[in-house]
Structures are given as C-alpha cells and as structure tokens.
Regions:
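Short, solvent-exposed coil/turn segments
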Residues: 31, 70, 99, 151, ...
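Active-site cleft segment of glycoside hydrolase catalytic domains centered on the general acid/base Glu
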Residues: 183-187
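Bacterial N-terminal signal peptides
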Residues: 14-27
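Outer membrane beta-barrel
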Residues: 37-179, 189-191, 197-206, 260-262, ...
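Compositionally biased, intrinsically disordered low-complexity segments enriched
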Residues: 5-8, 35, 122, 200, ...
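Sec-dependent signal peptide recognition
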Residues: 5-9, 13-17
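N-terminal periplasmic/intermembrane-space "pro-region" immediately following the signal or transit peptide
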Residues: 2-7, 25-54, 361
Length: 361
C-alpha cells in the first residue's frame, strides 16, 4: 500500500511539474489562437497515406559475403477529424523481416502552440534517434540511434511551441517503459519519462537537449543527451553525445557519440538533382540493453551483460538524389569498424559496403 501511494504521489508530482513549467512559459510564446471551432467547422477529413521503402545490398569485405535486404516497408495514415484533433497510425511491414506497429496515437491541439499526444509513439529524445528512415543521412543508423537511444513506447506527451526571438520547442511525456510489446499485461510502479528542448537559433543553428528514464527490467536507466547542428547553404554539420547511467551500479556507465558532415551539390541535371558527399564518425562504449540474462537468455535469475561491445566506426559515401533530398535517394556507403580487444562483432556489424535505394511517397 505504501509503494502504491509513493508511486501515485510521484506520478502526480511529475505531471504537475511538467504542466506548471509549460504554463509558466506560455506567456513568452506567440499569442495563442483558439482552435475551438464549432462542430460544423470546415476541416479536410481525407486521410493522407505515406510510405517509405528501403532496399539494400551489403557486402562484407573481410568475409567476402553479401546479402540483399528489405530494411523497411513502412506505411502510415494520418489526418484530422476536427480542426484540433488529428491522428496517425504507422506500421512497418518489413522491419528486418518482422511486422511492427510503430505509431498509433491521437493528438489534440486546444490552442495553437500547445499539443497533447496519447498513444504509441517515438519518445521525445535525442536528434538522430528521432529521425524517420527516409530522413537518415546514411544507409545505417548511428550507434546512438540504433543501440543506445532508440525508444518507442506507449504513453502521453505534451509539446509547446514558442518564440523568444527564435523558435523553441519543448516536449515532455510519461510512458509505460515496456516498449512496443507487452502492453496488455504490463503494470508498473515506476515512473518512466522523457523530456526534450529544441532551440532553433538564427542562421541554421540548432541546440537540442534531452533526458529520459526507462526501466527495461528491474534496473532503472537514466539517459542524458546533448546535440547540435548547423544546416544552411547545402551544408549539414552535426554532433551528438549521449550518457547512460544504470541504477545501483548494475552496469558501468555508457558513453556514445556521433558526428558527421554532408554537402548537397546541385548537378543541373533533370534526372539526378543532387550529389551529396558525406562522412561520419561514431563511437560507443560497452553497452547493456538493461535486461538480465542467464546462459544467453533473458532471466530474472541473471544479470546485465554486454549486448554491444565497445567500438568506433568511420563511414563515408555518396548520396544520389533524384528529387529533393530524402524523397528518392541512392545511398552508397563504406563502413570501417574498430573494436576493442576481446570484443565479439555481430554478423551485421563488420566492415562493409552498403548500396541502398530509398523511396518516400
């Protein structure tokens, strides 16, 4: 009974703190415009259908082995039912061979700068992990986006947009902590949350700060992320650092970093619009997914283990865009891995050449 009371008290306090912070900041933003139109207010209820197809060929240079893969076959439906209520549902028909429900949420905008989202979504955390597949610069994601900070969950989030001389976006939410599966019988006494602030400075500069608490198993995990980028005149320069801490010293702290630079070059051709050379460096220390293992299987009798060994990677390549970038791209990359002594490289995480065709519709 005491634990239940503590959980409820903690939950209410967290929600109240987020709400109070947003209410205090509201006067700084642009003047709110009410979206409370009448039931007969005009709104286009036509659903919008979008999708992303990513097909690629990878060749591992050391092993002399190659494979074709459909990495993503995503389809999404979104739209509005009233001037201030919208929705989105997204499914991946082939996420490395598996079918996954990704987004399923309703969004309410009672006033223009404020939005509430309830359902399953990508939590507000990091820069690179928050990118959709068609928005990625490289064929394979960074270590931050793939191993360390990639989280979708079920919960409720609030976002507030304001202008303090430059645009600022604040987001915060409470989530199950269960991930995409196991919702039906998942009950928790812990509070899992995420918060993110994006500052869009003049001349294409951005600073993003975020934090997140999850509890994949019996161990609480806190993550802190700081990233910045400059996007202007065809250039994109970005750097991001993530720090991950496990409670009760269940596993040593994890550090992850990535930095890259790209340059869109117009070709003047009617078919091939842009050629983009780009290069990336990313790094991660030994990493645990937060679950206990015994004899290679998840078990409450086990302990946290190294799921991803310490490594760094250098990636270089070219992207060929047949429309504006991130619509119809061919990505050609070479990845060079550097593992620590004694590390075991997974089959798909070795030196390789990647040729990917991405189509967004």
């Amino acid at each position: 009974m005491t634990r239940t009371k503590q959980f409820l008290t903690s939950s209410v306090a967290t929600i109240a703190s987020c709400a109070a912070a947003l209410l205090m900041l509201m006067p700084l933003g642009a003047k709110a415009q009410s979206a409370s139109a009448s039931d007969d207010g005009e709104v286009d209820r036509t659903p919008h259908i979008h999708g992303t197809l990513r097909c690629k060929y990878e060749y591992q240079t050391s092993e002399g082995e190659g494979r074709f893969e459909v990495r993503n076959a995503r389809v999404s439906v979104d739209g509005k039912v009233t001037p201030f209520i919208s929705y989105k549902a997204e499914i991946d028909l082939c996420d490395e061979g598996s079918i996954k429900m990704l987004d399923a949420y309703t969004r309410l905008k009672p006033i223009q700068p404020l939005a509430f989202t309830v359902g399953q979504m990508r939590v507000p955390f990091t820069i690179d992990a928050h990118r959709s597949p068609h928005q990625q610069y490289f064929a394979n994601r960074s270590f931050i986006a793939k191993q360390v900070g990639n989280v979708r969950d079920v919960g409720a989030a609030v976002a507030y947009n304001m202008n303090v001389g430059f645009p600022v976006v604040l987001e915060a939410g409470l989530f199950n902590g269960s991930g995409l599966t196991g919702q039906k019988d998942y009950w928790t006494k812990s509070v899992n949350f995420s918060a993110k602030a994006q500052l869009f400075f003049p001349r294409g500069f951005n600073l993003t700060l975020s934090m997140q608490k999850i509890r994949p198993d019996h161990t609480g995990v806190m993550m802190y992320d700081a990233g910045a980028y400059w996007h202007a005149q065809g250039w994109h320069v970005e750097g991001e650092y993530l720090y991950k801490h496990y409670s009760n010293n269940a596993f040593h702290d994890v550090h992850a970093f990535d930095a890259f630079i790209s340059r869109d070059i117009r070709t003047g051709s009617k078919a091939l619009k842009f050629v983009t050379p780009l290069v990336r460096y990313d790094y991660m220390s030994d990493h645990s997914d937060g679950s206990r293992y015994l004899d290679g299987k998840k078990s409450a009798e086990g302990s946290l283990i190294v799921n991803d060994y310490k490594r760094s990677r250098l990636t270089g390549g070219l992207t060929f865009s047949f429309a504006k970038p991130f619509i119809s791209d061919i990505r050609l990359n070479y990845e060079k891995y550097f593992y620590r002594s004694g590390a075991i490289a997974k089959p798909s995480e070795r030196d390789k050449i990647v040729l990917e065709v991405m189509t967004r519709f």
